């Protein structure tokens, strides 16, 4: 059996990410052998300029997608997708969720200092954020975290790949925020 062809067919047909274990079960190999085949396929797709597709890994799952270079051709045949606008407020809220997840709206609002209802709703609508469950606390508030779409959009395989701020950068941001607050209060 051509296992690589079977993996390609699975990923193409599913159209979304498929966990390693599910692929292994489908082709009746163990996960180690399946991962080796997937890694080989990823290298083959990336190294070939004659293939318009890539296979990407997203937090232990795999997905087939088009190479970014193919966008100009795809846009000619497909309707232009609705452009998402990530405002400063949305980016700030998304950053808090990405780094603090799982996080409640109350925790987000405590960090931001303002209501985040609209921002969180918009991020859920854009499929960058999802409900992860409820906190075991009074009122059982919803917990939010990032989605696979977030990982795809920001070009990372897992949350662990997000940049980590050094203590110096954190201090610089704090100073900038304090200066900004002073300017706003003086007006």
UniProtKB/Swiss-Prot annotation:
Alphabetized UniProt keyword annotations: Cell cycle, Cell division, Chromosome partition, Cytoplasm
Subcellular location(s) per record: Cytoplasm
One Gene Ontology term, aspect cellular component: cytoplasm
Keyword Nucleus: no
GO biological process, one term: cell division
Annotated Pfam families: SMC_ScpB
Purpose of the protein: Participates in chromosomal partition during cell division. May act via the formation of a condensin-like complex containing Smc and ScpA that pull DNA away from mid-cell into both cell halves.
Subunit structure: Homodimer. Homodimerization may be required to stabilize the binding of ScpA to the Smc head domains. Component of a cohesin-like complex composed of ScpA, ScpB and the Smc homodimer, in which ScpA and ScpB bind to the head domain of Smc. The presence of the three proteins is required for the association of the complex with DNA.
Family, as annotated: Belongs to the ScpB family.
Name this polypeptide is given: Segregation and condensation protein B
């Amino acid at each position: 059996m051509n296992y690589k062809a079977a993996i390609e067919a699975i990923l193409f047909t599913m159209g979304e990410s498929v966990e390693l274990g599910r692929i292994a079960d489908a082709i009746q190999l163990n996960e180690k052998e399946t991962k080796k085949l997937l890694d080989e396929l990823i290298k083959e797709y990336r190294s070939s300029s004659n293939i318009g597709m890539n296979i990407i890994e997203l937090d232990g799952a795999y997905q087939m997608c088009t190479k970014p270079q193919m966008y100009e051709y795809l846009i000619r045949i497909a309707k232009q997708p609705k452009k998402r606008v990530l405002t400063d407020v949305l980016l700030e809220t998304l950053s808090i969720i990405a780094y603090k997840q799982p996080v409640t709206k109350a925790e987000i609002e405590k960090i931001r200092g303002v209501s985040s209802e609209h921002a969180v709703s918009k991020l859920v609508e854009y499929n960058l954020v999802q409900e992860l469950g409820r906190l075991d606390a009074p009122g059982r508030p919803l917990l939010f975290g990032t989605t696979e779409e977030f990982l795809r959009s920001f070009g990372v395989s897992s949350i662990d790949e997000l940049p980590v701020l050094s203590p110096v950068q954190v201090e610089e941001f704090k100073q900038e925020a304090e200066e900004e607050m002073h300017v706003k209060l003086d007006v």
